[in-house]
Amino acid sequence: ITTWFINKYLPRHKLTIDIVHRSLLKDDCYGFLDATSYSRPRDFTISLHSKMKEIDYVKTLLHELVHLKQWVEGSLKMKSGRTYYKGKNVSDIKYYEQPHELEAFKLQEELYIQYNRDMCKSGKGKYNFKKLPQFTL
């Protein structure tokens, strides 16, 4: 999934991505992304809850990869402990209302469809998504 996403949406970037599977019950989430540096980040760790259904796992990974893309392209930034999205301070906005989260939740669904469609075309998938619309990220 990660290789598919990077090849499709960030092919010219040299990135290091570690994926860690562990219990995130105490963190009250299914996954999160950490960058080792906030200045032109290229090294990332994606932490994923180790006990998820396959569909939740895939969508959560895609959600975090959207955030990775936001960081790499510079639309998501951290300055002085504050989160900025497209130049706007979003730190005081509730989590589910933050614009970068809204984008990631929307795109995780679209990417899930696109990923499965691409896997079907390559003979690796198990779903039939031929009739679903195309989209661009």
Set out the residue ranges of the language-model regions.
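Non-catalytic architectural context of zinc metalloproteases
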Residues: I19-L25, V58, G87-I93
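Active-site recognition of the HExxH zinc-binding catalytic motif
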Residues: K59-V72, A104
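Long, well-structured alpha-helical subdomains associated
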Residues: K94-Q98, Q108-L137
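Active-site scaffold of zinc-dependent metalloenzymes
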Residues: R22-I55, W71-V72
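Post-HEXXH active-site segment of zinc metalloproteases
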Residues: I55, W71-L102
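Substrate-binding/catalytic groove segments of enzymes
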Residues: K69-R82, I113-G123
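Zn2+-dependent metallopeptidase catalytic core
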Residues: I1-K14
